[in-house]
Amino acid sequence: MRFFVPLFLVGILFPAILAKQFTKCELSQLLKDIDGYGGIALPELICTMFHTSGYDTQAIVENNESTEYGLFQISNKLWCKSSQVPQSRNICDISCDKFLDDDITDDIMCAKKILDIKGIDYWLAHKALCTEKLEQWLCEKL
């Protein structure tokens, strides 16, 4: 029983260590190098990520035919591999679980592929919520 408690705590705390809830300014700093990528301004991307995942790297949304993972809500139907959809095209050549940690380097690489192939409207929140009045999504600290 003595060993159960420490192992239990590790099991609870370890995933929390890997997760990251970003702020608008933290995310703006990390994504500043892709400002203008695919014709998308940084405030549009920051707005879209807020309405898509709430800046949470562990966000998971289950739909009827697929699941979306992480900060960019990347679908296992086309972009990443999961046991739920073994026939995924896995265009980004990555396990979907990799989008749930605090290292967003691979998330950004896959998001750029999505932008290249589908454009910003892949993320439904963009068209509905992030095409005007974008000044609120600017970070003053950049």
From Swiss-Prot:
Would you tell me the Gene Ontology cellular component terms? extracellular space; Golgi lumen; Golgi membrane; protein-containing complex
Q: Does the keyword Protease apply?
A: no
Sugar-modified residues: 64, 90
What species is given as this protein's source? Homo sapiens
Q: This protein's superkingdom?
A: Eukaryota
Disulfide-bond pairs as recorded: 25-139, 47-130, 80-96, 92-110
Organism lineage: Eukaryota, Metazoa, Chordata, Craniata, Vertebrata
Chief site of localization: secreted
Sites binding Zn(2+) sit at 68, 135
Q: Which SUPFAM superfamilies match?
A: Lysozyme-like
Descriptive protein name: Alpha-lactalbumin
Give start and end of each C-type lysozyme domain.
Answer: 20-142
